[in-house]
Amino acid sequence: MAEYKKNNNNDDKDYIEKLVNIRRVVKVVKGGRIFGFSALVVVGDGNGKVGYGTGKAREVPVAIQKAMDKARKRMKSVSLVNGTLHYPIVSSVGAAKVYMQPASEGTGVIAGGPMRSVLEAVGVHNILAKCNGTRNPISVVRATVEGLTSMSSPQLVAAKRGKTVDQITRKG
């Protein structure tokens, strides 16, 4: 359900908007049932920025629009190298445990469900990923975004340690 849409804000950026999940929720009252909808959306620019949002409303389009607005407001930057990660990451939120590992060129995005949406929106092209624990889409998306944003670039690590990037990234 990935769609390229023009952002309605003042800046002229194209975002990748992915609808991850829609849930129908019911409130039982004396006169019967009241139906509502909850939507989970991931928005990214395909170049290292990603955000997610949830929206609730009585109608599906309104819930999706609310979720997209929240996702655009909460966009975070991710440090990538050649369309993949710098190093393997493990992140967890609640019972959702997410493992992401960089992959060589041509591997593609090997991830399931909500993780795939986040990784494609942020602009990752080669990655191996696995989700353990709960398969709750909201928890999986949160864990994936937190893991990606917690990753620091070799330049930042080298600056903190007072070394050069070659000393940090050297194999052996």
UniProtKB/Swiss-Prot annotation:
Residues 15-78 form the S5 DRBM domain. Keywords: Ribonucleoprotein, Ribosomal protein, RNA-binding, rRNA-binding. GO terms for molecular function: rRNA binding; structural constituent of ribosome. One of its GO terms (cellular component) is small ribosomal subunit. GO terms for biological process: translation. The keyword rRNA-binding applies. SUPFAM superfamilies: dsRNA-binding domain-like (SSF54768), Ribosomal protein S5 domain 2-like (SSF54211). Gene3D superfamilies: 3.30.160.20, 3.30.230.10. InterPro entries: Ribosomal_Su5_D2-typ_SF (IPR020568), Ribosomal_uS5 (IPR000851), Ribosomal_uS5_bac-type (IPR005712), Ribosomal_uS5_C (IPR005324), Ribosomal_uS5_N (IPR013810), Ribosomal_uS5_N_CS (IPR018192), Ribsml_uS5_D2-typ_fold_subgr (IPR014721). It holds the Pfam family Ribosomal_S5_C. NCBIfam families: rpsE_bact. With S4 and S12 plays an important role in translational accuracy. Part of the 30S ribosomal subunit. Contacts proteins S4 and S8. The N-terminal domain interacts with the head of the 30S subunit; the C-terminal domain interacts with the body and contacts protein S4. The interaction surface between S4 and S5 is involved in control of translational fidelity. Belongs to the universal ribosomal protein uS5 family. This is Small ribosomal subunit protein uS5. It comes from Ruthia magnifica subsp. Calyptogena magnifica.
